[in-house]
Amino acid sequence: MNWGIPFRHLLLVLQLALLPAVTQGKKVVLGKKGDTVELTCNASQKTTTQFHWKNSNQIKILGKQGSFLTKGSSKLRDRIDSRKSLWDQGCFSMIIKNLKIEDSETYICEVENKKEEVELLVFGLTANSDTHLLQGQSLTLTLESPPGSSPSVKCRSPRGKNIQGGRTLSVPQLERQDSGTWTCTVSQDQNTVEFKIDIMVLAFQKASSTVYKKEGEQVEFSFPLAFTLEKLTGSGELWWQAERASSSKSWITFDLKNKEVSVKQVTQDPKLQMGKKLPLNLTLPQALPQYAGSGNLTLALEAKTGKLHQEVNLVVMRATQFQENLTCEVWGPTSPKLMLSLKLENKAATVSKQAKAVWVLNPEEGMWQCLLSDSGQVLLESNIKVLPTWPTPVQPMALIVLGGVAGLLLFTGLGIFFCVRCRHRRRQAQRMSQIKRLLSEKKTCQCPHRFQKTCSPI
């Protein structure tokens, strides 16, 4: 029998077995500090062969002995594991939990006379301080990285703004829209890992608001917050600058504790009313021209540096009629582009100007509308009814004057009438007197003649 060939085959197999394991290409895996990573290692065949994980110093970390998982005396001993259920499929991964920056190094998997190298790079991205920041404050994100790495960071804010940087990334002047989840991508050697950081921007829902009211109407000021906290404690104050006043003054001060509001001090004119629960609400009993102006509500939160601010404006409208003049006026901060108009109902505007007062002389009878509008959108409207001319306040005085004149004329006429009548009677009396006198003279003259006629001889 020829034993040469089998012996040569056995020798070749023995030599191959003694050869060192072949090293495969190195893979790069990026991990996040505090997270879990799985380093994969696969055999060419589905088998339950032996495998070992080591670090770059050839210290055994994890392996398989029979059907059991064995762990070495490395610093990862309490944070490593493997998926035993996948061993029979030729998958021999190493799972590292609660990653640390110092876990960054090269790990070697030995299986089937081959070596697979995996370079693990662990990064951490954290906010410089609290993730609850006041509107207007700055956000700084700091990247922790292993020595020798040169990563880049790109973050996208909830409002879609992109910010790029290196190991430090700064975002000045945070806005209310920046509140939410920030998505940051760390890149290294064409590999990426994604971080999500929740940032809460403490702010009011609106930076500024304007309330439009007719004179005499009740005014409601609302200051809703753009965030929700379980425990909310602080203090606030509303300062008001009236348009007609030379300086601003404090209208109300209050405390906020566990979302409940208590008033500390309030002015007597005007006497504001405040709700006892969030959102912050203030009520002004009447909108008057002397109250029109601008206010600034500040809210200081406990354990926070700085204050929240919201500006509020009050615009008051008045429509009046005096004598033959119909006037429409507004008080308070208004944009120069706003239009103020006076129009008869269902008719075109009689007057329309970019002004704070308009008027119409001798207005027609009917319902007039005073309108404050912005690009065709009516912001404020006040109606006033113009009555017919005769009942206007000026007529009674005219009637009194006319009555006086008529009375004077009548009195004068009656006086003249009675004077003429009196003269007429006097003349008539004089004439009668003359007639009587003449008649009496005629009688005395007739007696002798009558006597002579009777005594004459026959």
Swiss-Prot record:
Membrane topology: Single-pass type I membrane protein
Domain Ig-like V-type: residue ranges: 26-125
Post-translational modification comment from the UniProt entry: Palmitoylation and association with LCK contribute to the enrichment of CD4 in lipid rafts.
Domain Ig-like C2-type: 126-203, 204-317, 318-374
Transmembrane segments: 397-418
Example of a GO cellular component annotation carried by this entry: plasma membrane
Alphabetically ordered keywords of this record: Adaptive immunity, Cell membrane, Disulfide bond, Glycoprotein, Immunity, Immunoglobulin domain, Lipoprotein, Membrane, Palmitate, Phosphoprotein, Repeat, Signal, Transmembrane, Transmembrane helix
Record localization: Cell membrane
Residue list for modification Phosphoserine: S433, S440, S456
Topological domain spans for side Cytoplasmic: 419-458
Record keyword Signal present: yes
Top-level taxon: Eukaryota
GO biological process terms, semicolon-separated: adaptive immune response; cell adhesion; T cell differentiation; T cell selection
Positions of disulphide bridges: C41-C109, C155-C184, C328-C370
Glycan-linked positions: N42, N281, N296, N325
Residues making up the signal peptide according to the UniProt record: 1-25
Reported function: Integral membrane glycoprotein that plays an essential role in the immune response and serves multiple functions in responses against both external and internal offenses. In T-cells, functions primarily as a coreceptor for MHC class II molecule:peptide complex. The antigens presented by class II peptides are derived from extracellular proteins while class I peptides are derived from cytosolic proteins. Interacts simultaneously with the T-cell receptor (TCR) and the MHC class II presented by antigen presenting cells (APCs).
UniProt subunit comment: Forms disulfide-linked homodimers at the cell surface. Interacts with LCK. Interacts with PTK2/FAK1. Binds to P4HB/PDI. Interacts with IL16; this interaction induces a CD4-dependent signaling in lymphocytes. Interacts (via Ig-like V-type domain) with MHCII alpha chain (via alpha-2 domain) and beta chain (via beta-2 domain); this interaction increases the affinity of TCR for peptide-MHCII. CD4 oligomerization via Ig-like C2-type 2 and 3 domains appears to be required for stable binding to MHCII and adhesion between T cells and APCs.
Domains as described in the record: The Ig-like V-type domain mediates the interaction with MHCII.
Name this polypeptide is given: T-cell surface glycoprotein CD4
Lineage, top ranks: Eukaryota, Metazoa, Chordata, Craniata, Vertebrata
